[in-house]
């Protein structure tokens, strides 16, 4: 079969043609391995380390009791994952620690006892935690590693670069070394005052000047600068160990009387005692590497040693003298990752330390004869520390479950924030920026756009985390020399000839055979130079180790045996890009996508997109809503299958066999061994974001199943590939101005065929409790509710499954007893006759929120009577799930994968949409102006290649930086044109997609005088393009048989420009307007693009209110959709009303529509009665203003509560200066009438006042001034 139609993948049935040039050397690793491995480490090692740290616990004196912990075990979880999500419980396991108690006074060893240490949240198989019924993810933290760091900063006075050093432990006091411009090296201990470094050296045992100078004589040898001598001379009074100890002690403990023994003890505790000072495994490893100390076992001594301090000072001198380079603190060799296991361990440690303190206190007071381990240990601090971490830590996040990609990304996220990390405010530009050491470790594309940019990142596809917490990435080893006894030599080419005593054993350039290897291996041990080749051996390296090597790119040209084809190779060496001969290359990248995260490597033609837009594309894919009819992309990258596999939403067969039962609920496979594998399917499960997970089988009963085959798809996968959007026919053109500013025009066909329809599920809950006034009751018998409202409720007052519900519909009927007053004699009589029925109850039913609707898909009832475990005072608990089927609508946000996003502005009838020459209307019209300035040309290439794939009936995989190039796309378009010309494309409506008959196309091409088989063969790039252009020019009446290459393209371009008809390779079509039938002026780019519907749906955002809740203080409507609030009419909106002079509108906005309490009640009444709305009164905010002024100590009060507006003739007489009596003033000019105690108000004040002690202050609205000595006031 010709390669035009690639073979369908047997396991999935999807035809996907890959344009990858490079082989997959390393498979994509398990994408959630980091989470799983880390938690397993915590369970097996992390917890053991903690228990060893605190064991044994002794009393304060150390001679009464000793409590030893000798082991621990996790028991079985009490509830399954499913039960926990249903009942809002935490998925956890009980931890039991084996404790042994020793009574020191009698020597009695009590029997080991299993102590319950609380329930520890357990990680699910998908790397998440279920706490209180919701799935959460613990994000890994990226922070500065413990170790020693040498940095250089310029001295402000002299401009000379000076070394500054920090020694950061995992736990303990920091040491900071500084160099002054007078060559004195000083040290700060734990941030206290500086002391010369010579004082610290004397205090740790180098007491004599000569001893100190001898330590540094080899290094401190600059004739101009003598750092150690300058430091000694800086403090001439301190000449021995005791004076140095006392000096340091007096700085660290300023109030205590200094004493040499106490000082020695303090310094030993502070730096050399593992209980108080711990570099940690990582810190010790980093210190040893940086100071090039003799490599001893890392776990051996995690406290400081004298030698460490000396080595640090030696390095400071070397950095100052330019003999050593300073460190880059943003380098990934100096930043490590705290994964889940370590974060939980740190939190657990806090709880254990509190537990230890309580146990020691109890040991001192407990009765020795009656004592048991459980009497000493209080587990509450441990339980609360762990609970606090999972519930409230910045790093424990509500899992983003919008779609499968969002889940994976959330689990692979790295945050530089959180406890012990950076804050948004303090983080500068350098920390946020992309660093060369991120290559292959942290994605340079995927990061948020807001204030967290650069502080939150994502692990690259192939990266992993080593045991010290550093990110590693894989490289292929390049060999140019091998030992003469290495069996790898067989089959390799020699670079130089090998001879022994003048006899040539193997000539240069020859291939080493088995025989020649035997001769070479008998030579004395030596290195054999071979032609440099890339082996299959893969090595994972952290960033600091990688800096030592020269590394070639993944797309370096190799032959089939791994030899380099070029004489000069482009490569990286630390931050430099170099071109080197092959024998200098040490390693080579494993894949072009190793640089990027999962989300970024899902963007086809990423190499043609601007980084800013690629960032948006990567982030928006995570916001795509799973659609009702999931469709994998026409143009993919090949990562879709990996993302779907590790999301946990696709079900794969564990073993080969035959499908014995396939239903919507479960699949049963009968294996070859005769056993049965059962797979349960998730049906309409609500995610954290309200989207829907619904698995459905894609196999049939009786079908043979291979191991690893896809059995069931989820709501966002198709045939085991991620399917977040829809393939649409798009045209880039403007249409009636409806796609102005990135707006999108959609065809009604997409709405009708449910292309962008999605399911959203909401969960509603109600509890019936015991209250002080009586028991709440779930019932159908609700006061003042008509039968119409109860028609969908069952006899218990709970809605039936399948009911269609709308805003304010009752889901669960509930009545609550009202507070009862003293009953009258008549009421007591009624109560005695009719029993409880007559009592006062209020309706507290669960209703659908405003603006929501849907269909009830599930109801769960938990009752104390049925033995369910419910919280205190709760008798019954009902949960109702409501699903909405939302069609796409105007205002919804759509996006491509290249950062091209927009809002739907119109859904046009199919008959009005622009249509192709064959009558096919386009689905989406996008604005062409949105492309050039955004520089995301990937969308255009995707459109072209997608169109060719659409017409020829196959899908495409074009991996990032290793995909289809221009020639390939032009050839694909040319083949689709030739097939259409030959009538080989079946566009019949009963087919879901077009399909092409390759043989028919080849026959037709043969009739035109060309070799059809060659044209449809990928091995002849450019041939299809050339043939299609010649045939097109022939159709246009131009003879181009003698033309080829650039001349042919130039001719086709000229003819196309003159005729305004597109050539076959430009991916354009002549479109007609669906309303008029006339052709558009220019040919339009038409193709197939993958479009996503994002979770920013207009239905969740649109909101309107009539009457509703008000704020208690301001009496203004609440704000926001969640509170059913009003629209804020702010300062700027008021200015707009001023500008239009709409005084009445403005008045009612600020009064009866807002916080004029009496006015709004009257207005409502008037509207109901159909009368004119009365005049507004004083807004409540005026009273708030008065109260605020009073709170400042001003005696402000409203003189007359009865606010009246002055008649117009009164106002005009006031304006002419005719002042009324003061009691008239206070009654008439009212909205701003105030009373105050005032001393000094300027005469030319705009407001007129009466100035006298303790007199009324009247503010009038006219501009005339009130006479100061007017007697009437």
From Swiss-Prot:
Residues 1252-1273 are annotated as: Disordered. The keyword Transferase applies. Its EC number is 2.7.7.6. GO terms for biological process: DNA-templated transcription. The keyword Transcription applies. GO terms for molecular function: DNA binding; DNA-directed RNA polymerase activity; ribonucleoside binding. Transmembrane segments: none annotated. Coiled coil: none annotated. GO terms for cellular component: DNA-directed RNA polymerase complex. It is an enzyme of class 2 (transferase). It comes from the Bacteria. It catalyses: RNA(n) + a ribonucleoside 5'-triphosphate = RNA(n+1) + diphosphate. Belongs to the RNA polymerase beta chain family. The RNAP catalytic core consists of 2 alpha, 1 beta, 1 beta' and 1 omega subunit. When a sigma factor is associated with the core the holoenzyme is formed, which can initiate transcription. This is DNA-directed RNA polymerase subunit beta.
């Amino acid at each position: 079969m010709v390669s035009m139609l690639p073979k369908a993948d047997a396991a999935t049935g999807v035809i996907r043609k890959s344009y990858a040039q490079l082989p997959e050397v390393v498979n994509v690793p398990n994408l959630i391995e980091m989470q799983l491995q880390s938690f397993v480490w915590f369970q097996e090692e992390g917890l053991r380390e903690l228990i060893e740290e605190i064991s044994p616990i002794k009393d304060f004196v150390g001679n009464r009791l000793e409590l030893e912990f000798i082991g621990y075990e996790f028991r079985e979880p009490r509830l399954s994952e499913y039960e926990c999500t249903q009942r809002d419980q935490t998925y956890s396991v009980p931890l039991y620690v084996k404790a042994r108690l020793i009574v020191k006074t009698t020597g009695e060893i009590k029997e080991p006892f299993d102590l319950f240490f609380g329930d520890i949240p357990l990680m699910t198989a998908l790397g998440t935690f279920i706490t209180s019924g919701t799935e959460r993810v613990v994000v890994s933290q990226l922070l500065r590693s413990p170790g020693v760091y040498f940095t250089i900063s310029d001295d402000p006075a002299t401009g000379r670069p000076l070394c500054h050093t920090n020694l950061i432990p995992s736990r303990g006091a920091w040491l900071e070394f500084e160099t002054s411009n007078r060559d004195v090296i000083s040290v700060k201990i734990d941030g206290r005052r500086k002391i010369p470094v010579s004082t610290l050296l004397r205090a740790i045992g180098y007491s004599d000047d000569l001893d100190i100078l001898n330590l540094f004589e080899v290094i401190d040898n600059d004739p101009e600068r003598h750092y150690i001598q300058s430091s000694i001379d800086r403090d001439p009074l301190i000449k021995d160990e005791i004076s140095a100890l006392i000096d340091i002690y007096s700085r660290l403990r300023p109030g205590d009387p200094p004493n040499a023994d106490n000082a020695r003890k303090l310094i030993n505790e502070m730096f050399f005692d593992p209980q108080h000072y711990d570099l940690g495994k990582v810190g010790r490893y980093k210190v040893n590497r940086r100071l090039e100390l003799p490599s001893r076992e890392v776990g051996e001594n995690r406290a400081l040693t004298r030698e460490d301090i000396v080595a640090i000072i030696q390095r400071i001198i070397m950095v100052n003298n330019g003999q050593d380079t300073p460190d880059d603190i943003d380098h990934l060799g100096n930043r490590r990752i705290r994964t889940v296991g370590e974060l939980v361990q740190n939190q657990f440690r806090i709880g254990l330390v509190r537990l230890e303190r309580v146990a020691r206190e109890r040991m001192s007071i407990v009765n020795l004869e009656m004592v048991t381990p459980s009497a000493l240990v209080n587990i509450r601090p441990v339980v609360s520390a762990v609970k606090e971490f999972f519930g409230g830590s910045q790093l424990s996040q509500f899992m983003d479950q919008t779609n499968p990609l969002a889940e994976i990304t959330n689990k692979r996220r790295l945050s530089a924030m959180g406890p012990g990390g950076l804050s948004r405010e303090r983080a500068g530009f350098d920390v946020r920026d992309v660093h060369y050491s991120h290559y292959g470790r942290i994605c340079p594309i995927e990061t948020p756009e807001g204030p967290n940019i650069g502080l939150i990142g994502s692990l690259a596809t192939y990266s992993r985390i080593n045991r010290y917490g550093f990110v590693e990435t894989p490289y292929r080893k390049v060999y140019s020399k091998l030992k003469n006894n290495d069996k790898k030599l067989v089959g390799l080419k020699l670079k130089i000839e090998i001879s022994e005593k003048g006899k040539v054993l193997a000539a240069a350039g020859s291939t080493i055979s088995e025989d020649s290897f035997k001769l070479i291996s008998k030579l004395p041990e030596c290195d054999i130079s071979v032609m440099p080749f890339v082996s299959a051996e893969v090595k994972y390296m952290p960033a600091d180790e990688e800096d030592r090597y020269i590394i070639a790119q993944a797309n370096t040209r190799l032959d089939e045996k791994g030899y380099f084809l070029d004489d000069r190779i482009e490569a990286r060496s630390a931050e430099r890009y170099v071109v080197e001969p092959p024998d200098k290359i040490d390693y080579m990248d494993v894949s072009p996508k190793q640089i990027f995260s999962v989300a970024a490597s899902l963007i086809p033609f990423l190499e043609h997109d601007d980084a800013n837009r690629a960032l948006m594309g990567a982030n928006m894919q995570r916001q795509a809503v799973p659609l009702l009819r999931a469709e994998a992309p026409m143009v993919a990258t090949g990562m879709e299958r990996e993302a779907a596999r590790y999301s946990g939403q696709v079900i794969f067969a564990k073993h080969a066999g035959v499908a014995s039962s396939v239903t919507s609920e479960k699949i049963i496979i009968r294996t070859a061994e005769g056993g049965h594998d059962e797979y349960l399917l998730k049906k309409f499960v609500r995610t954290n974001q309200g989207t829907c997970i619904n698995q459905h089988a894609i196999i049939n009963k009786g079908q043979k199943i291979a191991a690893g085959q896809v059995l069931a798809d989820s709501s966002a996968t198709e045939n085991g590939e991620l399917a977040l959007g829809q393939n649409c026919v798009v045209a880039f053109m403007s249409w009636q101005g409806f796609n102005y500013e990135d707006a999108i025009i959609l065809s009604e066909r997409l709405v009708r065929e449910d292309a962008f329809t999605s399911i959203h599920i909401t969960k509603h809950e109600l509890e019936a409790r015991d209250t002080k006034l009586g028991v709440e009751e779930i019932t159908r018998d609700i006061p003042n509710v008509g039968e119409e409202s109860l028609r969908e409720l069952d006899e218990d007052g709970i809605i039936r499954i399948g009911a269609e519900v709308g805003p304010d519909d009752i889901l669960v009927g509930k009545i609550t007893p009202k507070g009862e007053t003293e009953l009258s004699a008549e009421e007591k009589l009624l109560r005695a006759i009719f029993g409880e029925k007559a009592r006062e109850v209020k309706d507290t039913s669960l209703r659908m929120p405003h603006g929501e609707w849907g269909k009830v898909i599930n109801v769960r009832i938990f009752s104390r009577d049925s033995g369910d475990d419910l919280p205190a005072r709760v008798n019954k608990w009902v949960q109702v799930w409501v699903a909405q089927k939302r069609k796409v609508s105007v205002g919804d946000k759509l996006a491509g994968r290249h950062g091209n996003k927009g809002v739907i502005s119109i859904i046009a009838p199919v008959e009005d949409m622009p249509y192709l020459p064959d009558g096919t209307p386009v689905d989406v019209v996008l604005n062409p102006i949105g492309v050039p300035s955004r520089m995301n040309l990937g969308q255009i290439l995707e459109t072209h290649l997608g169109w060719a794939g659409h017409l020829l009936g196959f899908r495409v995989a074009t991996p990032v930086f290793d995909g289809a190039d221009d020639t390939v796309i032009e050839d694909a378009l040319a083949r689709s044109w030739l097939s259409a010309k030959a009538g080989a494309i079946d566009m019949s409506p009963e087919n879901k997609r077009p399909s092409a008959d390759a043989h028919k196309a080849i026959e037709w091409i043969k009739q035109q005088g060309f070799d059809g088989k060659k044209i449809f063969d990928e091995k002849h790039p450019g041939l299809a393009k050339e043939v299609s252009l010649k045939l097109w020019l022939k159709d246009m009446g131009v003879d181009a048989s003698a033309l080829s290459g650039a001349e042919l393209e130039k001719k086709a371009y000229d003819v196309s420009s003159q005729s305004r008809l597109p050539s076959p390779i430009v991916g354009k079509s002549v479109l007609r307007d669906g309303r008029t039938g006339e052709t558009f002026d220019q040919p339009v780019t038409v193709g197939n693009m993958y479009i996503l519907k994002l979770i920013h749906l207009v239905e969740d955002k649109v909101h309107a209110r009539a009457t509703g809740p008000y704020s208690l203080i301001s009496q203004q409507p609440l704000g926001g959709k969640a509170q059913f609030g009003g629209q804020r009419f702010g300062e700027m909106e008021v200015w707009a009303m001023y500008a239009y002079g709409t005084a009445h509108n403005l008045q009612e906005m600020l009064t009866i529509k807002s916080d004029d309490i009496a006015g709004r009640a009257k207005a409502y009444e008037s509207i109901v009665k159909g009368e004119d709305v009365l005049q507004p009164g004083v807004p409540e905010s005026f009273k708030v203003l008065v109260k605020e002024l009073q709170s400042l100590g001003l005696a402000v009060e409203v003189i007359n509560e009865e606010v009246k507006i002055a008649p117009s003739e009164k106002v005009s007489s006031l304006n002419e200066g005719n002042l009324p009596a003061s009691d008239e003033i206070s009654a008439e000019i009212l909205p701003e009438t105030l009373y105050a105690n005032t001393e000094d108000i300027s005469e030319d004040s705009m407001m007129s006042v009466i100035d006298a002690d303790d007199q009324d202050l009247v503010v009038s609205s006219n501009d005339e001034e009130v006479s100061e000595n007017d007697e009437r006031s």
